[in-house]
Amino acid sequence: MKYLLDTNIVSETIRPYPNKNVQQWLSEVPSGLLFISVFTLGEIRRGIEKITDSKRKNHLLLWLEQELPNWFGENVLPINQEVAERWGYLTSILTQQHQLTAIDTLLAATALAHNLKMVTRNIKDFDVPGLEVLNPFD
């Protein structure tokens, strides 16, 4: 099985006290089976830009620009035609009760297009037909 990591999973790895269950799960899965979306990088960058402490901000920028590319390498997935079409389909069938953000539906579409299991803390954010979801925090 291959996995698409949500932003909250990637961000957990840089926290001062990361969740032990997430750490254990990540250590048990070969890194070649872990993928992220370009949108995850964008969400992380957006969060970093809001930080006012320049030392922390610079530390996180270094992590984003150097460590994450080393960790994921070629496993950073772009938005291609198949993902875009699946996203269009998903947004057309999901009702107002789902309240999924554009980024969450793009991540779901990416996971479906690449046959990946979505890994997130926010299971309810990925209530999408056909999408397998895993919460390593539990």
Predicted regions, residues:
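Acidic, PIN/NYN-like endoribonuclease modules and their adjacent C-terminal/linker elements
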Residues: 1, 108-138
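Short secondary-structure boundary/capping segments
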Residues: 1, 25-28, 67-68, 76, ...
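Short, well-structured N-terminal submotif of metal-dependent ribonuclease cores
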Residues: 1-36, 49-66
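Histidine- and aromatic-rich ligand-binding microenvironments
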Residues: 5-6, 37, 99-101, 122
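Generic structural signal for small/hydrophobic residues in well-ordered secondary structure
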Residues: 6-7, 22, 44, 87, ...
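Residues that scaffold the ATP/ADP-binding catalytic core of kinase and kinase-like folds
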Residues: 12-13, 25, 47, 87, ...
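Active-site neighborhoods of divalent-metal-dependent phosphate/nucleic-acid chemistry enzymes
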Residues: 46-52, 70-118
